[in-house]
C-alpha cells in the first residue's frame, strides 16, 4: 500500500494524541518539509526525484517514537508501518534514516554492535539507498526538535552535546559532510541557500 505526504502527516497527528512527548513529531515535520525543499530544487536541476515521496518519508522516519521512546525506534517504526500494510519503499525509511555509508556503526551517538541486530546490519549493508532516502539522511542531520533547520556544523554539535562522543563520532561526522557535499554538487550551489532562515539559527 502506498502513502502520500498528506496521509503520512495524518499518521503523525493521530499519534500526537497518544505520545508522551510530541517533540519528535515537530522534528518529523521539519525533516519532511526540508526534504521537500531540497527535492524540488533537485527536480529543477533536471534530477529525477519524487518530491511528495521525499516529504512523506521525512514525515514517517521517526514514527517508531510513537510511544515516546527513542531507543528501539528504528525497528519499531519499520514494524509499525509494515503491520499497517504499507509498502517497503515507505517502511524502509525507518531503518535507513539514521545510518550513513551503508554501515550501522555510522550513526550519531554511538552505533549498535552489528551482531546485536543481524537483520538491521545486513539490511543497511546491502540496501541501495534511493535519492529520497539520502535526502532524509541529510535532513535528519539538519533538523533539531522544533520547527527549525540548522547548519550541519551546529546540528552535529547539538548531537554530541546531547548524545556524547563515541569511537564512531569522527567517522559519522566525516560521512555527514560527504553527504552534504554530494547534494551541493548535484545542485551546483550550497544547499543552505535554499533555507534563508538558517542564519537565524546560527
Task: List each model region and its residues.
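His-Asp-centered metal-binding catalytic motifs of divalent-metal-dependent phosphohydrolases/nucleases
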Residues: 31, 49-84, 91-102
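Active-site flanking loop/helix segments enriched in acidic
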Residues: 4-27, 57-65, 100-104
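An amphipathic alpha-helix signature
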Residues: 9-12, 32, 36, 78, ...
